[in-house]
Amino acid sequence: MGEMHWIIRHTQRLQWHRLLPLCLCLIVFMLHAPFSTLSAQESQTAYNFLRLPVSAHAAALGGDNISLVDDDATLIFQNPALINDVSDRTINLNFMTYMEGAKTASAAFLKAAGERGTWGVTAQYMDYGSMKETTADNQELGTFSARDIAIGGTFAYALTNELSGGVTAKFITSYIGSYNSLAVGVDLGLNYYHEDYDLSVSAVARNLGGQFKAYNDDFDRIPLDLQIGATKRIGQSPLRVSATMSRLNDWSEGFGRHFAIGADVLLGQSIYVAAGYNFRRASEMKISDAEGSSAHGAGLSLGAGLSLERFKLHVAYAKYHVSASSILINISYAL
């Protein structure tokens, strides 16, 4: 019996050593951002709808969370490595109000692939509504519409009992009036989860790739985002805290603006309430007037969720634009 136990442990150690170089290469690749993106700002990238959170639970925790381990299909949009804990054959629908006249919707379907794998397909759509079309001297020519679409496929695999990896490949297109652009992007994710300590640590590289068809002669970057994050339950209490650092490929701004923090309180097995704060969003939406400057609540997010055996409902409130507040709703059902 002791000899068999030694063989099992030795085999697991050999498997880990075979996987370790792959994991280290992925981490090094993520931490060494392309030099061309070091000073890239949001205004210099296209398809910025990909920066918006899709998961209401992640949105409530500050918007950038990549380390939440839960039976929540929307986490496929935050970190592809997180979907191994999602129920088999889960279908998910999401809707969010954005600024006036703009709406965004998304959907996902996830299915188990063997004992250690999970695959999923996703779709995201953003409609900016109708806008006035004018000449250079402000003469009205009519109206035009704009919309963005992304379609993706994801595969995640449990490398060990604690470590999972995932990859999402996506096709992205955008329409502005009669103009159209096309791009491809890849998300890479790692998650380490220690069940005994209820500790989750993740690293994600989002939107690796670029345009292959521009609106005109000038090609735009897609919004590359390197992120690290952790989530920890405090002892046996119902309190769970999270911290995420995003845009680690862009250090042209202050250190503190890279952080989003959040906490959720688990009210039994089925209900949670959550709150978070995003320092970048608060800074970007700060407005100055005669009385000083204020973010007017931007940066703060709130949310709650109900998780039953087959049905999940999550709702979050936040501000992603200076002109309006946003409500994000997720509905999931395991078939």
Which positions does each model-derived feature cover?
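N-terminal secretory signal peptides that target proteins for export/translocation
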Residues: M1-H17
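Low-complexity, intrinsically disordered short peptide segments enriched in small/polar/basic residues
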Residues: M1-H5, L24-I27, A263
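A periodicity- and composition-biased signal for non-globular, repetitive helical segments
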Residues: Q12, L19-L24, H57
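Bacterial N-terminal signal peptides
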Residues: P21-P34
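Sec/Tat signal peptide C-region and signal peptidase I cleavage site
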Residues: F35-A40
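Subset of outer-membrane beta-barrel
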Residues: Q41-L335
